[in-house]
């Protein structure tokens, strides 16, 4: 059984929600990483409770006990990504799914333009936590359900939008410019 969490305002990263992505030749999946500020104690608390529930649910999958080296989905950005300022003072979870997540705007209107939800924008996410035992790997996974775009943010790829980078040009005669 999976436990669902709806996050508060989190930052999307490594967004692959409109087309599935294959990692190292694996089966293509839809995925997104969610950066959660450490100040969002409500979301972090919900995730910690869901992870604990998944751990308890997993006891039967794991031979009647919780393994000591369990892989857990909630990670500390200050420890796991110390050189990336986007993860400073934040936790993160990587969520994925075999099925395309639902994606809506603030008013719950479906978003179909892949450029509208990008690494760096802010979203709310519906994610689930469940135990797994695959090929000797045991842990709690994070499933991607749905995403609601909250607002735009600075793209994490470092690229600036053209309309933000340039001033408007006056109507100037190009021939005068060349002389």
Q: Predicted segment positions?
A:
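Short acidic, low-complexity segments enriched in Ser/Thr/Gly/Pro
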Residues: 76-112, 117
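Exposed beta-sheet edge/beta-hairpin loop segments within beta-rich domains
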Residues: 107-123, 130-140
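OB-fold/S1-family single-stranded nucleic acid-binding modules
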Residues: 134-154
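Acidic, gly/ser/pro-rich intrinsically disordered tails
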Residues: 1-4, 154-179
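Broad gene-expression machinery/nucleic-acid interaction feature
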Residues: 29-31, 90, 122-124, 139, ...
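OB-fold ssDNA-binding interfaces and closely related basic DNA-contact patches used
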Residues: 1-92
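A short secondary-structure junction signal
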Residues: 45-47, 104-107, 135-140, 158-159
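Residue-level recognition of well-ordered beta-strand positions that form the cores
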Residues: 33-35, 94-96, 126-128, 148
